[in-house]
Amino acid sequence: MAARLCCQLDPARDVLCLRPVGAESRGRPFSGPLGTLSSPSLSAVSTDHGAHLSLRGLPVCAFSSAGPCALRFTSARRMETTVNAHQILPKVLHKRTLGLPAMSTTDLEAYFKDCVFKDWEELGEEIRLKVFVLGGCRHKLVCAPAPCNFFTSA
C-alpha cells in the first residue's frame, strides 16, 4: 500500500503542499479552497525524514513538519487526455515558477480537485500519480517535461 499524503493549497506561496500522514492518525478534516481535505495533526507528521513511509525520490523537505517546499503533482492519465493535452501541465507549472504567463491559480485548483483527488482518493490510483518539484526549493528535484513516478508500493 502506498503512503498516504495530505494535500493543502498554500496561497501565500501559490503551491500545493503534500504532507505525510502517519498510520496512527489521519488528522482532522478542514475546509479550504479545494474542498474538505484531511489535515494531519503535528503528532502525525514524521520527524525521521519519512523512513517509515513507502516513498522514494522525494526531497528531504517533503517530510518536514512545515511541509515540502514546492511539490506539485497530477494524474498521468488525465494529462494524456485530449482536453488537457494542449496545456502540458509540467511546462505550465514550470512557466509559473519563472513568472511567465500560464494557467491561472483558479484553473489549477479546479484541475487538481477534479482530476487528482478523484483518481487518488476515490479510485485509489496512487501508482498513477506523478510528482513535480519545481522552483524555489534548494531540495528540488525537477521532473519535467518527462515526469518520474515516485510513488511505490510497500
From Swiss-Prot:
Free-text description of this protein's post-translational modifications in UniProt: A fraction may be phosphorylated in insect cells and HepG2 cells, a human hepatoblastoma cell line. Phosphorylated in vitro by host protein kinase C or mitogen-activated protein kinase. N-acetylated in insect cells.
Keywords: Activation of host NF-kappa-B by virus, Activator, Apoptosis, Host cytoplasm, Host G2/M cell cycle arrest by virus, Host mitochondrion, Host nucleus, Host-virus interaction, Modulation of host cell cycle by virus, Transcription, Transcription regulation
UniProt-annotated location(s): Host cytoplasm; Host nucleus; Host mitochondrion
Region (Mitochondrial targeting sequence): 68-117
A GO CC term assigned to this protein in UniProt: host cell mitochondrion
Main location: host cell
Superkingdom of source: Viruses
GO terms classed as biological process: DNA-templated transcription; symbiont-mediated activation of host NF-kappaB cascade; symbiont-mediated arrest of host cell cycle during G2/M transition; viral genome replication
Xref: InterPro entries: Transactivation_prot_X
Keyword Oxidoreductase in record: no
Pfam families in the record: X
HAMAP family the UniProt entry points to: HBV_X
Family, similarity comment: Belongs to the orthohepadnavirus protein X family.
Role description: Multifunctional protein that plays a role in silencing host antiviral defenses and promoting viral transcription. Does not seem to be essential for HBV infection. May be directly involved in development of cirrhosis and liver cancer (hepatocellular carcinoma). Most of cytosolic activities involve modulation of cytosolic calcium. The effect on apoptosis is controversial depending on the cell types in which the studies have been conducted. May induce apoptosis by localizing in mitochondria and causing loss of mitochondrial membrane potential.
Known partners and oligomeric status: May form homodimer. May interact with host CEBPA, CFLAR, CREB1, DDB1, E4F1, HBXIP, HSPD1/HSP60, NFKBIA, POLR2E and SMAD4. Interacts with host SMC5-SMC6 complex and induces its degradation. Interacts with host TRPC4AP; leading to prevent ubiquitination of TRPC4AP. Interacts with host PLSCR1; this interaction promotes ubiquitination and degradation of HBx and impairs HBx-mediated cell proliferation.
Name the UniProt record assigns to this protein: Protein X
Gene label: X
